[in-house]
């Protein structure tokens, strides 16, 4: 009779580490490598070695890509980002998407530098538009950030025909928006599609008639917190 593998040793330790430490988004690897390189080059100098290791650890935490379990309800619209809900209002979607000027329900999430900064699809559907618009790099927690700051908008059409727009907005420190979504892509709810480096904001425009079920000041978990349900 074959023996069962022992629950110890290097492989078991590696499995425990993988289960406890979130993986890193590919966009963060160059930053982590730079920190490790500084530590290696300056290994004879404690302050330089420590600075490099600290920078690498900080970047690993910032670019973490934790696993998430989206809800199974087909009508759910989930948060596209971790952070604090800073505004719930109505506004016309970004003009570059050519969706008209009729106000739609909007939920805004502010991401601090301590939040995970990967973005996830708020719904399942097809990407029908991706538009980038240059702009300012003002503080992302201010109301005018939605209109003035640099942004990338992703428009997703659900199987029932309803549309949801997720807008990545650069901030005072975050000056690099990464969007991996392209027109024609089929996304499942909770799929990772982008990242904003070092602090930012996410605006989610809901279908007309959808009512947000979250509150200002509430913490949102990307891919899991339900913002609203599509009627």
UniProtKB/Swiss-Prot annotation:
Provide the GO MF annotations for this entry: phosphatidylserine decarboxylase activity
What this protein needs as a cofactor is: pyruvate
Transmembrane regions listed in the UniProt entry: none
- Pfam family membership, one: PS_Dcarbxylase
From the UniProt record, give one GO term of the biological process aspect. Answer: phosphatidylethanolamine biosynthetic process
Q: How is the cofactor bound?
A: Binds 1 pyruvoyl group covalently per subunit.
Q: Which InterPro entries match?
A: PS_Dcarbxylase, PSD-A
EC numbers for this chain: 4.1.1.65
Instruction: Name the UniProt key words of this record, in alphabetical order.
Output: Cell membrane, Decarboxylase, Lipid biosynthesis, Lipid metabolism, Lyase, Membrane, Phospholipid biosynthesis, Phospholipid metabolism, Pyruvate, Zymogen
What reaction(s) does this enzyme catalyze?
a 1,2-diacyl-sn-glycero-3-phospho-L-serine + H(+) = a 1,2-diacyl-sn-glycero-3-phosphoethanolamine + CO2
A Gene Ontology cellular component where this protein is annotated is: plasma membrane
Q: In which pathway does it act?
A: Phospholipid metabolism; phosphatidylethanolamine biosynthesis; phosphatidylethanolamine from CDP-diacylglycerol: step 2/2
Highest taxon listed in the record's lineage: Bacteria
Site features described as Cleavage (non-hydrolytic), chain residue numbers: 199-200
The membrane topology noted for this protein in its Swiss-Prot or TrEMBL record is: Peripheral membrane protein
Catalytic residues, per the record, are 200 (schiff-base intermediate with substrate)
Q: Which compartment or compartments is the protein found in? A: Cell membrane
What post-translational modification information does the record give? Answer: Is synthesized initially as an inactive proenzyme. Formation of the active enzyme involves a self-maturation process in which the active site pyruvoyl group is generated from an internal serine residue via an autocatalytic post-translational modification. Two non-identical subunits are generated from the proenzyme in this reaction, and the pyruvate is formed at the N-terminus of the alpha chain, which is derived from the carboxyl end of the proenzyme.
Give all Pyruvic acid (Ser) modified positions: 200
Question: By its UniProt entry, which PANTHER family does this protein fall under?
Answer: ARCHAETIDYLSERINE DECARBOXYLASE PROENZYME-RELATED (PTHR35809:SF1)
- What is its biological role? Catalyzes the formation of phosphatidylethanolamine (PtdEtn) from phosphatidylserine (PtdSer).
Matching entries from HAMAP family are given as: PS_decarb_PSD_A
Would you identify the family this protein belongs to, as annotated?
A: Belongs to the phosphatidylserine decarboxylase family. PSD-A subfamily.
The entry describes its oligomerization and partners as: Heterodimer of a large membrane-associated beta subunit and a small pyruvoyl-containing alpha subunit.
Q: What is this protein called?
A: Phosphatidylserine decarboxylase proenzyme
Q: Which organism is it from?
A: Mycobacterium tuberculosis (strain ATCC 25177 / H37Ra)
Gene name per UniProt: psd
